[in-house]
């Protein structure tokens, strides 16, 4: 079995995963660059009980520990859905102090922005999740007032990488690590508009992997495994 996105825990399975913990940590790192004085953050979580939600939340918590100038003022469940996120944020906003940033898990950004706008609250820096409506909103705000943020998420096309990993296993490769970490897809102020141009209305940014890219990903993870083994063996 080759799994992707979510995690299969059986040792015999292969797992193609994004470093979701780093993803959460990088959300706070980016906010720290733009908001050196810190402030209150609103966290929008994903589906409760999933490994992805736990990992991203853990990364966000680690980022806040490294940057104590920030504090999580409140946390709501957005379930990776714009409408759900908008309702959840709208419900909690009246009880919150000024929010300087919104950290989330992808797909919540546009809903959060709509909630702040409807409540006539000052727009915080909202981390986006690579969806077309989020990036389009970001583009509009950038043109209007120079709005700056960061966007990241797993690429739906990671399923193609899992396919090629399965093909390599069936082709007889015995050296493929059972845990394969691949980069998440991220955009910044300089390149998100180019990505937006290629995303259909209602869609999400993605990348389809080739066989060669899959082989490079496998080799990169093999090197990581070898380096960890070497480090462990070098310890007294």
Please provide the spans of the model-predicted regions.
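Flexible loop/hinge segments that line or gate small-molecule binding clefts
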Residues: 1-22, 26, 33, 40, ...
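Hydrophobic alpha-helical
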Residues: 60, 78-138
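Structured segments of extracytoplasmic/periplasmic soluble domains
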Residues: 4-7, 30-38, 63-67, 88-95, ...
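Periplasmic-binding protein-like
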Residues: 1-4, 42-43, 73-76, 96-106, ...
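Stable alpha-helical elements in mature extracytoplasmic
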Residues: 23, 27, 52, 56, ...
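An alpha-beta-alpha
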Residues: 25-70, 74-75, 166, 173-198
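Hinge/cleft segment of the Venus flytrap/periplasmic-binding protein
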Residues: 63, 154, 163-236
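Solvent-exposed loop/turn segments at secondary-structure junctions
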Residues: 1, 7-10, 47-51, 78-82, ...
